[in-house]
Amino acid sequence: MKVNYDLKMEEILKEISESGKKKRLLIHSCCGPCSSSVLEYLKEFFEIDIYFYNPNITYDYEYVARMEEQKEMLKKLDYDMNVIEGVYNPKEDFFEKIKGLENEKEGGQRCYSCYDIRIGETAKKAKEEAYDFFSTVLSISPMKNVNYINEIGEKYSKEYDIPFLFADFKKKNRYLRSVQISKELDMYRQEYCGCVFSKIEKEQRDREKAEREKQEGEVKND
């Protein structure tokens, strides 16, 4: 049966609103643009800290660019939120853990493992620091598997005994809102998820698109 994760989130937010007191939330973020509309929406219900743990980002220059953009976004929006940086060790925390899945297509088992790595570490950190909830912004992307994300969140909620904020953040135009905020703030918005495999796939799609457009142009000129 298909689960409405947006509805599950709204039920949790309703309870928090009725309690009259904000809860503490540690939310995993992959980048500033993806977190923008999520934070805008959730700040009315939570005291939020951002956990920037992304060992899947292969290149250190890309990692630094996304981290700095995350911090800069909070400054521009004047959000009273802390960015907690996790350990950045792609070799041990990503490549070692996805061995054997290198040739998987984007959206498959390798991505599941990547979500698992990051959400699991977020749950662990949230438990250690006594947050009321943990979550991730990953479901803001139309390209991400919302079932994978929430199933993993539920798994670690049970393991660490801390509530997971279920979500399908792209719903109710929040993805479009994230794009709008990114443009308004002139934010750096990356063109691939983060790992070298997603970068290679993106470059391949671009080449195929360019070739199609070239062929279509030649047909029109005949």
Regions from the language model: what does each represent?
Residues M1-D222:
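Nucleotide-activated chemistry modules centered on ATP-dependent adenylation/adenylyltransferase
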